[in-house]
Swiss-Prot record:
Alphabetically ordered keywords of this record: Abscisic acid signaling pathway, DNA-binding, Nucleus, Stress response, Transcription, Transcription regulation
Ranges of compositional bias, category Low complexity: 115-124
The gene coding this protein: BZIP46
CDD domains referenced in this protein's UniProt entry, alphabetically: bZIP_plant_BZIP46 (cd14707)
Name of the protein this chain belongs to: bZIP transcription factor 46
Chain positions covered by the region annotation Leucine-zipper: 270-284
Posttranslational modification: Phosphorylated on serine and threonine residues by SAPK2, SAPK6 and SAPK9. Phosphorylation is required for full transactivation activity.
Effect of loss of the gene: No visible phenotype under normal growth conditions, but mutant plants exhibit increased sensitivity to salt and drought stresses. Decreased sensitivity to abscisic acid (ABA).
Gene3D superfamilies named in the record: 1.20.5.170
Record's miscellaneous remark: Plants over-expressing BZIP46 display increased sensitivity to abscisic acid (ABA).
Amino acid sequence: MELPADGSALARQGSIYSLTFDEFQSALGSAEKDFGSMNMDELLRNIWTAEESQAIAPAAAAASAAAVVGDAQQQQQPIQRQGSLTLPRTLSQKTVDEVWRDIMGLGGSDDEDPAAAAAAAAPAQRQPTLGEMTLEEFLVRAGVVREDMGQTIVLPPQAQALFPGSNVVAPAMQLANGMLPGVVGVAPGAAAAMTVAAPATPVVLNGLGKVEGGDLSSLSPVPYPFDTALRVRKGPTVEKVVERRQRRMIKNRESAARSRARKQAYIMELEAEVAKLKEQKAELQKKQVEMIQKQNDEVMERITQQLGPKAKRFCLRRTLTGPC
């Protein structure tokens, strides 16, 4: 594959993956090469070759930026070659046209023109052709790289200071909707209040949240709006938990009070029954003593009546048993 001598077409682009297939083909200067007939392995090899050529090719824009910054900076691509471009085994041998038809849901035979198939599938709405699709969109939709891995935030090594003589600088990231990617519950005001200290080397945050390159010690800590937003979000939940806990404590106290009252009433009932039984026992013992005394008196009275007044004369006397 032959590249243009000056490489200006590629150097003017911020990323090769933002080029469409037609632009990429014209930038390479190989109009006779048909990307649709290539398989996915050949397409990736061409992209990687163009990446290496773009990194080596001198560009006027890069030279002027290097003069302002102080040293040359290597262009950071939104899709990393080593970690994210991994072809599945079933996809590596497919041609670009076959993959594009699978993406668009056209199906059809291999000899069918992709543009004609797209026009026949949706006559009311014009479908984009393969040449109008960017490389990044094609790779993401084909499943070569996940969409979240394709999104990369680049922090430049220097940014304009907000206050002279301080290391607090204006954020270099452009937030489209005022929200930080991957951070939930951060208001636009909190995102605008963020400040980032300038690192000595570029710091790249890829889509997986991994920090690549640079010195992390120069980054300033997260400011207070994050904590405020999280506290506001967690407030109602904490209040509900406390309210449920208080209601549970009140119910437990009421249940314990009812249990103590039932126990006390049962004890008092038992004590009353014991006292009543004691009184009955005392009365029965008294009646028993009276009955025994009455029986004894009746027995003595009968004996007296049978013996009469001579009963006292009967007594034992000693008889003479010795020799006369």
